Amino acid sequence: QAIGPPYGLCFQCNQKTSSDCTEARRCSPFHEKCYTLYQPDENWMKSSGLSHFGCGKQCPTAGPEGRVTCCLTPRCN
């Protein structure tokens, strides 16, 4: 199973819908960038907000109160 271009290997889960974010999985072809999208909770506290881990062709854009980290390995997400 090839890892690396054109395939990435990233953590892919949403803390809101899944508590198991422990295993990186192969991304779709040419979705090589791993990202973590941080979103604040209902009280707008970033420290206790939820995270979405995924992979894409490019990094997603965070909303006004969120932030994104992005890289080429699952170590950053």
UniProtKB/Swiss-Prot annotation:
Q: CDD domains, from UniProt?
A: TFP_snake_toxin
Disulphides: C10-C34, C13-C21, C27-C55, C59-C70, C71-C76
The organism's superkingdom is given as Eukaryota
Where would you find this protein in the cell?
Answer: Secreted
Under the heading InterPro entries, the entry gives: Snake_3FTx, Snake_toxin-like_sf, Snake_toxin_con_site, Toxin_cobra-type
The keyword Disulfide bond appears for this protein: yes
Main location group: secreted
Q: Where, per the database record, does this protein carry Pyrrolidone carboxylic acid? A: Q1
Q: In which tissues is it expressed?
A: Expressed by the venom gland.
Database matches in PROSITE patterns: SNAKE_TOXIN (PS00272)
GO function term, MF aspect, one: toxin activity
A Pfam family of this chain: Toxin_cobra-type
- What family does the entry list? Belongs to the three-finger toxin family. Ancestral subfamily. Boigatoxin sub-subfamily.
Biological role stated in the UniProt entry: Potent postsynaptic neurotoxin. Displays readily reversible competitive antagonism at the nicotinic acetylcholine receptor (nAChR).
- The identity of this protein, by name, is Alpha-colubritoxin
Organism per entry: Coelognathus radiatus (Radiated ratsnake)
